[in-house]
Regions:
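Short, well-ordered beta-strand core segments
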Residues: 27, 102, 119-123, 165-166
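The Walker A (P-loop) glycine that initiates the GxxxxGKT/S ATP-binding motif of P-loop NTPases
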Residues: 7, 19
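Small-molecule kinase domains that catalyze NTP-dependent phosphoryl transfer to phosphate-bearing small molecules
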Residues: 89, 97, 116-117, 128, ...
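Walker A/P-loop
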Residues: 14
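Post-Walker A helix-loop "phosphate-sensing" segment adjacent to the P-loop in P-loop NTPases
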Residues: 21-30
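Hydrophobic anchor at the beta1->P-loop junction of P-loop NTPases
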Residues: 3-5
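ATP-binding Walker
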Residues: 11
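ATP-dependent small-molecule kinase phosphotransfer cores
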Residues: 32, 36-98
Length: 187
């Protein structure tokens, strides 16, 4: 069974994914794939060429500034990254096709129209103020949060495609209890 985990920006998807998959099955993380891409020279060369970045240092910071100056750069970046993430996802699915449960954390699952690839989809949500606080703690800022948040579909639209909506506004203990209660139905 393929279980998708998605949600609003900085809603706790990574934490939820780790809770759900822990001891239950393998976990694919689109964010982890993207992070790995940035550590590869070939990818950085592509980024530097596509976005006219001369230096090899602080590429992510320079990209963030370029996105803030010109919102179309998000789409340009997504066109580079998404096919590479999908390729890694296909490898993951092939490798673990015989597992009872597999988990895939994909922030833009709905926007990428990947719903049909999943048996069950969890949606994580939290108040915008709490999500902003989490985003800033991870090194972002309010302006960038708003840019990324406005690029995504509204929660109300995304929720229509999901089987379970989990609000993450309390402790990790409460989140874990709520997630595992739902997951028991599929074990």
């Amino acid at each position: 069974m393929k279980i998708g985990i998605t949600g609003s920006l900085a809603s706790g998807k990574t934490t939820a994914s780790k809770i759900l998959s822990s001891g239950k099955g393998p976990l694919f993380s689109a964010d982890r794939v993207v992070k790995e891409l940035y550590s590869k020279n070939y990818f950085n060369k592509i980024i530097r060429k596509k976005f006219n970045i001369g230096t090899t240092k602080n590429i992510k910071k320079i990209l963030k500034n370029k996105i803030l100056k010109d919102r179309s750069n998000i789409t340009k970046l997504e066109r580079l990254i998404h096919p590479l993430v999908r390729k890694e996802m296909a490898k993951f699915l092939k490798k673990y096709k015989n597992k009872k449960l597999i988990f895939l954390e994909i922030p833009l699952l709905i926007e990428s129209k990947l719903m049909k690839n999943f048996d069950v989809i969890f949606f994580l949500k939290s108040k915008k103020s709490l999500s902003l606080k989490r985003f800033i703690l991870k090194g972002g800022n309010k302006e960038l949060f708003n840019v990324f948040n406005n690029k995504q579909l509204k929660d109300e639209k995304k929720i229509k495609f999901c089987d379970h909506v989990v609000t993450n506004e309390k402790s990790i203990i409460v989140l874990k209890k709520n997630l595992l209660k739902i997951l028991k139905r599929y074990e």
